Amino acid sequence: MYSAGQKILMYHLACVNCGATFPADEIIYNCKKCGHLLAVRYPLDTLSVKRETWNNRPLSVWRYKELLPVTIPPITLQEGGTPLYHLERLGKEMGLKHLYAKHEGMNPSGSFKDRGMTVGVSMAVQLGKKSVACASTGNTSASLAVYAAKAGIPAVVLLPAGKVAVGKIAQALMHGAKVISIRGNFDQALEMVHELCLSHGLYLLNSINPYRLEGQKTIGFEALDQLGDVPDRFVLPVGNAGNISAVYKGFMELEELGFIDRLPMMTGIQAQGSSPVVRAIRENLPEVIPEKNPETIATAIRIGAPVNAEKALSAIRKTGGLAETVTDDEILQMQRDLARKEGIGVEPASAASVAGIRKLVQMGAIDRNERIVCVVTGHLLKDPDTVIKQCEPPIEINADLPSLLSALHL
C-alpha cells in the first residue's frame, strides 16, 4: 500500500458538474464553485495495481485498498465479503436462470452502510476530526454508531420521529451514539445535521460525503469477483441514491483500469410512495423533483429528496439501465418469498430490488438470459415489527402431546 504522503498526493476531490478540483484533505461536502456533488478521483493511468494482487487477499472491503482513500490503519470490523446467493427457486418462477442476491445484511451492523462507514470513519480519524454525525432513516445511524464506537469517538445521529424501525434505533443507542429524534422527515434531519457539521466542526457521514461512498463501491467489486464476470444488470433499492452511484463509479474505475470491458446496466428500484428518481427517468427530467411527504413501509428508502440523485440519474442513463417502482404490497410479498423460498431474511427495503426485477420481467422490459445481481441491503432483524405484522402469531397450546398433534393437524 502507498505511504500516507504518497497516497494523499495521488487522489483529489472533483466536482461532478463543473470539474473543479480540491485537495484530498480539504473538508468540504459540496463544490465551492457551483454547489454540486463531489467525487474522489484517482490517477488511474498511473495506479499500480493488479487483479492478481486483489485475488490473493480475503474477500472484504479492504481487499481493494488501492482504490480507497484511507492511508492510516483502517477502522474495521471485517466488513464486506458478503454472500452472493443464486436465487434458484425465485429465478425459475420468473424464468431467469441467472438471478443472484448480494446479501449486505450479513455485514457487522446488518446493512451495506458498514462498507461506507469503515472508510468514512477511518477518514474522519485520518483528517483529525474528533466527532462524527449523520441524519438517518435507521441503517446509517446504526452503522455510524458501531464504527464510531470502534474508533473511540463520539457520534451524533438525527432521526425522523416515529419513522425509524426499532431494531435500528436499538443499535444506535446500544453503541453509545447521541440519538436526537426530530419532529420532521429525513430530508429536514439531513439539512439540520449538515448545518451542525459546518458550524461546529463535526464530520458529516451521510452519503453526501464522497469518501463514504468509496467504501460502498466495493459491493460491485465483490460481486464481480464472486461471479467471475461482469453482471449484465446490477439492481439496487434507491433511497438517498448513494449506493447505486457508488457502485457505478466503481465499475467505471475498473473499466478505466482495463479490468473489465463493459459496464452493467445500473437499475434502480424505488417504492411507489417515494420515487423521485423513477419519475425523473420516466419523464426524462434533468434533475429530480423532490417529494415533500414520501411514504412507504420500506423506511430505509423513504426519502423524498435524494442527495445523490444527480449521480444516480447519470449511472442509470449512461449504462442503459432502468428505474421502476414497486408497491408496498409487492415489497412485502418479495420479503416473504425471499425468506420462505430462498432462506434469505431481509428488511422491506432490501426486498425492493428483487421485487423490481419480478415486475420488470412481467413487463417484458428485460432479457431473461441476463445475468442479474440484486443487492439486498439490510437484515431481516432490522425491522422485526413489520415482520410480526405480516405473520400469523405463534400457536399457544397446553404442554401435552395431544395438544401438539392437534395443532399440527396430525
State the predicted function of each range.
Residues Y2-L410:
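PLP-dependent amino-acid enzyme catalytic core
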